[in-house]
Amino acid sequence: MLAGRAARTCALLALCLLGSRAQDFGPTRFICTSVPVDADMCAASVAAGGAEELRSNVLQLRETVLQQKETILSQKETIRELTTKLGRCESQSTLDAGPGEARSGGGRKQPGSGKNTMGDLSRTPASETLSQLGQTLQSLKTRLENLEQYSRLNSSSQTNSLKDLLQSKIDDLERQVLSRVNTLEEGKGGPKNDTEERAKIESALTSLHQRISELEKGQKDNRPGDKFQLTFPLRTNYMYAKVKKSLPEMYAFTVCMWLKSSAAPGVGTPFSYAVPGQANELVLIEWGNNPMEILINDKVAKLPFVINDGKWHHICVTWTTRDGVWEAYQDGTQGGNGENLAPYHPIKPQGVLVLGQEQDTLGGGFDATQAFVGELAHFNIWDRKLTPGEVYNLATCSSKALSGNVIAWAESQIEIFGGATKWTFEACRQIN
């Protein structure tokens, strides 16, 4: 009788195992386990199989992470090849240009000569286009390296969705870019063809930026809301960021930010604030060969900033409506001051605050020649004049540094458009 009971026990246990593992597609194994006569045999079998499932999931996760790393390394190698090809194209374009053609089309738009929008792409020579594309690809390479490092440090949180995005979204865009580069390498098109090719390449690169941004969203959930930067890789009239909040009426202000750019001539417009009836209510701009300027109610003061060396710089501008007194700080040190800048004119409320573009109309009217090219982070605004000590704390990343009481740098408050991107940045850890 005991033998019959044991046989029935094993049979029931086998049935429980078959039910609990019905979703497995591998071979089924049967395990007989001694349990008390009055115990729940199905529950015991599930507990015994739980450890095995956990081990299987861990092994699968490790395999996924390894595949992700291999995919990222493959993308980095592809970008190196693209950069090499672009270099060869640029060299060939220089050799093909005649003595009088080497610098043609390279002049910057003068005021009043019309906007350099995407419809005017043929104004930029091929060598400059290829140089910009090379810089953009280098930026993509850096961001892929950041993704690789993030994957290595946070492998336990990776999923198959990241792998799928890496394979399906980066691969097809890189094939498009490679095709465009080969076209440039093999033939010499006329101005119309050059314009079309550049437009197609920039469109592909913009899409690639957007799709890499989707991958970088995996980092966003695991970082503080202020540990990010904005990147504007190309000088266009459609790439920008918008601050969701507007400004109140202000009789004094301090605006501070971190900037990194090597654009020349002129880094462009880090930010602009427009209100109904006045597009230049508050603007910071460096255009052409002019020095950087601050505009308040269309009144101008020249600032002593020199920041287009490809390094991170912290800049601040303070202003009070009384006598229009202003001060300018670079890297924590005051470099200039003045007065009579829009005196007794308060900053008007209910406007539109844009990062990366100069507004000719409320919320729009962007001009590609005035666009900011580079990286921007920790944009803060206060409704008072900060002291030199407070500015220094910001520039040195002191624990005493303050966040803006009007506009504080927060990822949830910034919307990006046209291929501008957000990715992780910690001031003073990544600078220079």
UniProtKB/Swiss-Prot annotation:
Superkingdom per UniProt: Eukaryota
Tissues where the protein occurs: Cerebellum, hippocampus and cerebral cortex.
Signal peptide: 1-22
Assembly and interaction partners: Homooligomer or heterooligomer (probably pentamer) with neuronal pentraxin receptor (NPTXR).
UniProt entry keywords in alphabetical sequence: Calcium, Cytoplasmic vesicle, Disulfide bond, Endoplasmic reticulum, Glycoprotein, Metal-binding, Secreted, Signal
Disulfide bridges in this chain: C256-C316
Cofactor requirement: Ca(2+)
Biological process terms in GO annotation: axonogenesis involved in innervation; cellular response to glucose stimulus; cellular response to potassium ion; mitochondrial fragmentation involved in apoptotic process; mitochondrial transport; neurotransmitter receptor localization to postsynaptic specialization membrane; postsynaptic density assembly
GO molecular function: metal ion binding
Its biological purpose: May be involved in mediating uptake of synaptic material during synapse remodeling or in mediating the synaptic clustering of AMPA glutamate receptors at a subset of excitatory synapses.
Domain Pentraxin (PTX): 226-428
Region listing for Disordered, in residue ranges: 90-128
Protein's gene: Nptx1
The record's free-text note on cofactor binding: Binds 2 calcium ions per subunit.
Cellular compartments per GO CC: endoplasmic reticulum; glutamatergic synapse; synaptic cleft; transport vesicle
Residues binding Ca(2+) 1, per UniProt: N280, E358, Q359, D360
A Pfam family annotated for this UniProt entry: Pentaxin
Lineage of the species this protein comes from: Eukaryota, Metazoa, Chordata, Craniata, Vertebrata
UniProt-annotated location(s): Secreted; Cytoplasmic vesicle, Secretory vesicle; Endoplasmic reticulum
Keyword Hydrolase listed: no
Keyword Metal-binding attached: yes
Positions of Ca(2+) 2 binding: E358, D360, Q370
Protein name: Neuronal pentraxin-1
Residues carrying a glycan: N154, N193
Post-translational modification (record): Glycosylated.
